[in-house]
Amino acid sequence: MQKSEALFTRAQKTIPGGVNSPVRAFKAVGGTPRFITKADGAYMWDADGKQYIDYIQSWGPMILGHNNAPIREAVIEASCSGLSFGAPTEAEVIMAELVSEMVPSMEMVRMVNSGTEATMSAIRLARGYTSRNKIVKFEGCYHGHADSLLVKAGSGALTLGVPSSPGVPANVAEHTLTVEFNNLDSVKEIFETHGDDIACIIVEPVAGNMNCIPPVEGFLEGLRAICDQYGSVLIFDEVMTGFRVSRGGAQERFNVKPDLTCLGKVIGGGMPVGCFGGRRDIITHIAPTGPVYQAGTLSGNPVAMAAGLAALTQIKQPGLYDSIFENTQALVDGFQDLADKHNISLTTNIAGSMFGIFFTDVEKVTNYKQAINCNTEQFNKFYHGMLEQGVYLAPASYEAGFVSKAHDAEVIEKTLAAADKVFSTL
């Protein structure tokens, strides 16, 4: 670990905290972050040459595994024609058509560069479309680092213990109404008070930033009904779940149609890509066809579009998800069986190729309060034990894990063998 330690010390002199995204700093689990030099399939290697089975998968994008050959070749080919034009390309058109085909609720699509851009723009659009100010989000759900969304947020904000960030003016935060995930009554109550001024509900249909928490039965359907009743826009933040919990995202898996959808991560094949889209009558309020302004110098970047198209073309092929979901289930079942074997209080959640492990005696974790009351000290011991065994999990107990096409039965078996050793020490 000498090289990672030296790089971390060096990085802290010129990069805040030594990292460019807070959760990477290992602040939640302690110790030195591993500096990665390469990745392939289900594996990554650090600067000291140690190999890891990777369950972060770049925080979700790499559903086909690291260093996927068709994506790599598409990026190389596209880059030979130029890196950025600042003008429309056919690749953008093909990408929008493909996204609309795979996620039919997205009748029109606007490309951006990140998930944060997508959610920020979708909320502005919802406000412009409805001429209302307030938005509803859920405790522990993270939708990027836009000011109005950093109120009781999840992900790195939750890990740092500052779910409502300093630097967000009170007169901005007051328009963000926060309610309990998986609790329809709390949503109904807030609408009874503020319904006439609520522009939208934004929700992760599977909460992936307070670990992995699927919706309880009827929750998403209830949000749809409330938005219909009050004329508010329902936004699904599928930056994490899009093309990961099913080919058509969480909205296909749970059969609930939002008005707007935000995508990121998988859609870029590892490159920085996001998009938002939805009902034609709403999307046409975006400039240049409407008055709601949104723009981006690198939006629709040709190299990024090439990577995304190569990823989605493979994802469209029949049978891909069957094996990924089967292996994810085997992993999660294995964790649970081993924890039971060693008398460890553990519960697990799963949604497609996303999973969560919670050190708790609660039978099923369904909300923010249960998630933050899990045994983080025990998770940290498990985390470092697995890291020592060559298994790279998310360095925070509030982050979901991800399985890719490259995580075959052999990889799962190796992971569970490592977990057996680590559980025996807890």
From Swiss-Prot:
Enzyme Commission identifier(s): 5.4.3.8
GO biological process: protoporphyrinogen IX biosynthetic process
Record-level GO cellular component terms: cytoplasm
Source organism superkingdom: Bacteria
Main location: cytoplasm
Oligomeric and partner information: Homodimer.
Entry protein name: Glutamate-1-semialdehyde 2,1-aminomutase
UniProt source species: Alteromonas mediterranea (strain DSM 17117 / CIP 110805 / LMG 28347 / Deep ecotype)
Gene: hemL
